[in-house]
A protein has these predicted regions:
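Short glycine/acidic-rich loop motifs that flank beta-strands on beta-rich extracellular proteins
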Residues: 432-436, 448, 454-457, 502-503, ...
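Acidic Gly/Asp/Thr-rich repetitive segments characteristic of extracellular carbohydrate-active
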Residues: 400-432, 934, 956, 961
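Predominantly extracellular beta-rich ligand-binding scaffolds that present long acidic/polar faces
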Residues: 687, 717-933
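Surface beta-loop-beta hairpin patches that serve as ligand-binding interfaces in beta-rich domains
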Residues: 379-383, 891-997, 1006-1011
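Right-handed parallel beta-helix/beta-spiral solenoid domain characteristic of secreted/periplasmic
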Residues: 353-357, 441-529, 554
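Beta-strand/beta-sandwich contexts
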Residues: 269-343, 357, 384-413
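Short, acidic Ser/Thr/Gly-rich low-complexity loop/linker segments typical of extracellular
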Residues: 1-31, 157-204, 356-357
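Right-handed parallel beta-helix
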Residues: 516-527, 541-554, 568-593, 608-622, ...
Length: 1018
């Protein structure tokens, strides 16, 4: 009850006692005397406001078993009612029409009871009161983000976990019916009153049964009070999980709830300066493609061509990255032009230009001729030359039957009715179903308006999915992987896909039957939990996942797309999932989250040889494991990660060190009996923009390589190639703000730009000497000495003297302005980062370095541009390489200034990774293409062009070299060739970042110059 731990001058828990009296009564003026003499007394209760005295007609439950009135022993001296007489009415007071017992009789009220007190006996007299409405159960709750800290001194949780404000909280009964909906306040607190149970007289001290309700935090859907339809709650925050827990509630008691939630997205929770993961202003975005044959499909043209209609997304409302919070002069949302522009541009199908019949900002009519074939449709604006990453596949003819799914119909029914090779066309609409793709079919949406909604509401959706999965497996429609049968979930329950239940799209297949046609294309996929957006279990060879907007999904091991299993083993070791040759292309993968494993956005697990992740926009994803944006875990040889935008992703875990804010390559740990990891296989990471990613609890803000090599050593060496990447403005809590390398012994790093990356020295592995002061870490590129077991497998011994390493190969790279900080608890009231730039201290730059090597050991870059080339080979250049527009990381509000401190706020009473870094800008800014005055132009070497054909083009797919020698860095300078128009302002009065998409044209100017990094150690 609410009055525990209190002293009150009155009734406590309804109990009372008399141990004295005044002879002659209160008005006699007598003296109070201790002890009560044996006598007959009358005890009266005063009924408080809001309560009523229980009378014969006040029976409140008229169902259940009937009980006979117990005959009492006269020796018990049961007190009798002696109040005023009243007439019992004919009907029950709470149930009109139900006859009262003793109807019409005169009965005494029970507010006064006659008590016969005898020597040596107790004489209790209980009084029974009620309210017409049963006494409510009271709730007081608190929402916290367990992966973020509060740095606002005005907040009640300052120095503790961050409390997300204004989230919807829904209470459901066992049928799933919503009982109440409330909202948290600005500090994450909420309260509610809930109906109590009807069950009484059970075998418990109170006699009252608890009522069980499910509490759903950040509940996405509510009933529209006007229409009665289910609508999205306007306070639902898609950056956070929808977490449901069951609690018990008692009438009249207050239940205190601690209800944490987990972010789906990187940098979630802060209403101000939100992460900008929408396409830039004036970028063409396809909303829908249609034709007379239905959707992005035309029957094979014979003779003349066939028309298709391409509709743009038009003007789109998006979160404003310049919104400062309540009271901001900038609006919370802004509008961006995602139309096609008034000036005619270009439409290509599989690289061939289509004839334009009509062009407007909203719609294009184009002709598909008989020469054209099925392929990728892309639109390029005529006014600025921009081409978006998100296109759509247009099918010219079909090898099988064509199925059409209209809005309101079932996609799963179409899959069930299709045969291998069939094309399933899905119209725009909100399809709230969890799909199981178990056939070799093409699942084709009309565009991002066709939404596969993975939210499991109502609860029957998950039940139907379980039934469907069990039925398909029992019928032999798909096979499980070795060792997958009878695996329990985290609660010990055995069922199929226990740890990844209900992804929005589950892909399964039979063993030894590789897909020939399977494709998932042209959808928005959102709202999933546990299983994530798309989960490919196994035997998914040759699957294509393309042109989808995959947003706000969460999974136990990955948020958006996952291939295979990170930890599945059998007696032979890690299980090969047989997901080879999967192609993940032209998707917008934004603000998804994974709780474990690797890859908040995309997760590649053991057995995905020759996968390709190309031309995707991967932004704002979060992982509590490795790899905020992309995670490759286990052995998958021959993978490619190319031409992607990997922006503002994050990984963080308070309890352990996790690496790779943008991209992580991680070999699976050795199994019992093994000494070395199986490794990762060889992987190429090329022509990516890797910007603004954060490894808050470990190494490798942009890229981390861990346990790449292992069991293959002595016979072979897996090789990692880093070519043509712009790795800029990333942050690591430990070493390697740009890239961290550990147990990777054959790495080729050629023609990359590592610029303005930071190491904050705030992760727990940086606190070598204790929690008061950390050790500064290497920022640009950090190479860690391989484990002794790896060296032994290579036939080498640990280095004893200073060495100059020929691994990794470092050629034609820019390393500039990569800063190193460390934490000092003596700085400011709660500690801070050093150097103190605001206090006049100069930044410390740390471009390259070795970890755990003898003092004096060095890497051996050649033809590289370094902040300081002192001590390196003569082919290197020191100084400023001069790019179009660079900037330093800054505060979340990224005030433009020439210098500034990194500011941090700890979770004061916690250990592990107790410092959480917050920074900005979190919108596209800067342009790291070479300026015309750059000393990097024609300063490189051509030695590797004949070895690696990938290097014959730069990050913009322009020919290298442009002249006699290659330029240093990812960009090959072309004066005036295909210049990007630079940043285009939003309708709100702020700039929107510049630079073209990788593969879409050369350098251009624009952006802001920001020099302050704020590590809000919240």
């Amino acid at each position: 009850l609410r009055n525990w731990n209190q002293i009150r001058p009155g009734v406590f828990d309804g109990g009372y006692a008399f141990d004295s009296y005044i002879p002659g009564g209160w008005d006699s003026g007598g003296t109070e005397t201790s002890g009560l003499p044996a006598a007959t007394y009358v005890v009266e209760t005063a009924v408080p406001a809001g309560y009523k005295l229980v009378k014969e007609e006040d029976k409140n439950v008229d169902f259940g078993q009937e009980y006979e009135v117990m005959r009492t022993d006269p020796l018990l001296n049961v007190p009798v009612c002696v109040g005023d007489m009243h007439t019992v009415p004919n009907q029950l007071s709470l149930f009109p029409g139900v006859a009262s017992r003793y109807a019409g009789e005169q009965r005494p009220l029970c507010d006064m009871k006659q008590v016969k007190l005898e020597d040596g006996r107790n004489a209790p007299a209980d009084f029974f009161l009620f309210t017409e409405a049963p006494v409510a159960a009271n709730v007081r709750g608190f929402i916290t983000d367990d992966l973020d800290n509060e740095g606002n001194p005005q907040a009640p949780t300052f120095g503790e976990k961050y409390a997300p404000p204004w989230l919807p909280v829904s209470f459901h009964d066992y049928t799933g019916r919503e009982i109440a909906r409330v909202y948290s306040d600005e500090f994450g607190s909420y309260n509610a009153m809930l109906p109590p149970p009807f069950t009484n007289n059970i075998g418990s001290p109170s006699g009252v049964s608890p009522q069980m309700y499910e509490v759903c935090i950040n509940s996405p859907y509510m009933t529209d009070p006007a229409s009665g339809n289910l609508i999205k709650d306007p306070n639902f925050d898609p950056q956070y999980s929808n977490t449901c827990l069951v609690f018990q509630f008692m009438p009249g008691a207050t239940t205190y709830l601690d209800t944490p939630i987990i972010p789906k997205a990187a940098n979630a929770g802060r209403g101000q300066f939100p992460t900008d993961c929408e396409f830039p202003h004036h970028t063409p975005v396809i909303q829908k493609v249609d034709s007379a044959d239905g959707g992005p499909y035309v029957a094979k043209p014979v003779g003349g061509g066939k028309e298709i209609m391409i509709y743009s997304a038009g003007t789109v409302e998006v979160p404003n990255p310049y919104y400062e919070g309540p009271g901001s002069s900038n609006p919370k949302t802004t509008f961006r032009d995602h139309g096609f522009g008034a000036a005619q541009g270009v439409v290509t199908l599989d690289g061939d230009k289509l004839k334009i019949l009509e062009w407007s900002a909203d719609m294009i009519r184009a002709e598909v001729a008989s020469k054209h074939r099925t392929g990728q449709l892309m639109v390029e604006r005529g006014d600025n030359g921009r081409q978006g990453l998100l296109g759509i596949t247009v099918h010219v003819g079909a090898s099988g039957s064509v199925h059409h799914v209209a809005n309101g119909e079932s996609i799963q029914d179409a899959i069930d009715n299709a045969a291998a090779g069939d094309l399933i066309l899905v119209e725009p609409g909100d399809y709230r179903e969890l799909l199981i793709v178990y056939k070799d079919v093409i699942l084709q949406g009309y565009g991002r308006g066709a939404i596969i909604n993975g939210i499991k509401s109502p609860k029957e959706i998950l039940g139907q999915w379980r039934t469907k999965v069990d039925k398909l497996f029992a019928q032999g429609e798909f096979d499980l992987l070795p060792g997958q049968q009878n695996r329990p979930d985290v609660f010990g329950e055995y069922r199929l896909f226990a740890n990844e239940e209900g992804p929005a799209v589950l892909v399964v297949n039979k063993e030894n039957t590789p897909f020939q046609n399977a494709r998932i294309d042209g959808f928005t996929i959102s709202g999933a939990d546990a299983g994530g957006g798309i989960f490919v279990n196994g035997y998914g060879e040759n699957l294509t996942i393309s042109n989808n907007r995959i947003i706000n999904n969460q999974g136990n091991f990955s948020g958006a797309v996952r291939l295979g299993h990170p930890t599945l083993t059998n007696q032979n070791g890690y299980v090969d999932a047989m997901n080879d040759n999967v192609f993940i292309s032209h998707n917008q993968i934004i603000q998804n989250g994974g709780l474990d494993g690797s890859g908040g956005g995309v997760s590649i697990c053991t057995g995905a040889d020759d996968y390709k992740i190309a031309d995707n926009f991967i932004c704002g994803n979060f992982s509590a494991g490795y790899g905020g944006g992309i995670g490759h875990r286990g052995l998958s040889d021959g993978g490619e990660i190319v031409r992607n935008w990997i922006l503002f992703n994050k990984n963080f875990n308070q309890g352990s060190s996790v690496n790779g804010g943008g991209v992580s390559l991680l070999g699976a740990p050795p199994l019992p009996g093994d000494v070395l990891s199986p490794g990762t296989g060889s992987v190429t990471i090329g022509s990516n923009l890797i910007q603004g990613n954060l490894a808050g609890a470990g190494r490798g803000g942009g890229i981390s390589l861990d346990q790449v090599n292992g069991q293959e050593l002595g016979q072979n060496k897996y090789q990692v190639q880093l070519f043509n990447n712009l790795v800029v403005n990333n942050i690591a809590g430990a070493s390697g703000g740009g890239v961290s390398i550990a147990d990777a012994v054959d790495v080729r790093i050629i023609n990359n730009t590592f610029y303005s990356n930071d190491s904050t020295g705030t992760s727990m592995e940086s606190f070598v000497a204790g929690p008061l002061k950390s050790t500064p870490q290497i920022s640009g590129l950090a190479y860690h000495r391989p484990q002794n077991q790896v060296l032994a497998a290579m036939g080498e011994t640990p280095p004893q003297n200073p060495v100059t390493l020929d691994n990794p190969v470092l050629v034609n790279n820019i390393f500039h302005n990569n800063r190193s900080f460390y934490w000092d608890s003596a700085t400011g009231p709660t500690g801070g980062l050093i150097p103190d730039i605001d206090g006049g201290e100069a930044p410390v730059f740390s471009d390259l370095g070795l970890v755990n090597y003898p003092q004096g050991s060095m890497l051996d870059p050649r033809y590289c541009y370094l902040t300081d080339a002192t001590g390196y080979h003569a082919s290197n250049i020191g100084g400023d390489p001069v790019v179009m527009d660079d900037y330093f990381n800054g505060a979340r509000d990224w005030v433009i200034e020439l210098g500034g401190n990194i500011v941090g706020q700890p979770a004061i009473d916690e250990g592990g990774n107790f410092i959480d870094v917050h920074f900005g800008p979190l919108t596209l800014t800067g342009n790291y293409h070479l300026a015309g005055s750059s000393g990097a132009i024609n300063a490189g070497t051509n030695d590797y062009l004949s070895v690696f054909s990938f290097l014959k083009k730069d990050i913009d797919s322009q020919k290298r070299p442009n002249g006699n020698k290659s330029d240093i860095g990812a960009d090959e300078y072309y004066a005036g060739a295909n210049p990007d128009p630079g940043p285009t302002p939003d309708p709100a009065p702020q700039p929107d970042g510049g630079g073209g998409f990788p593969g879409g044209g050369g350098g251009g100017g624009g952006g802001c110059f920001i020099n302050e990094l704020v590590a809000d150690r919240y």
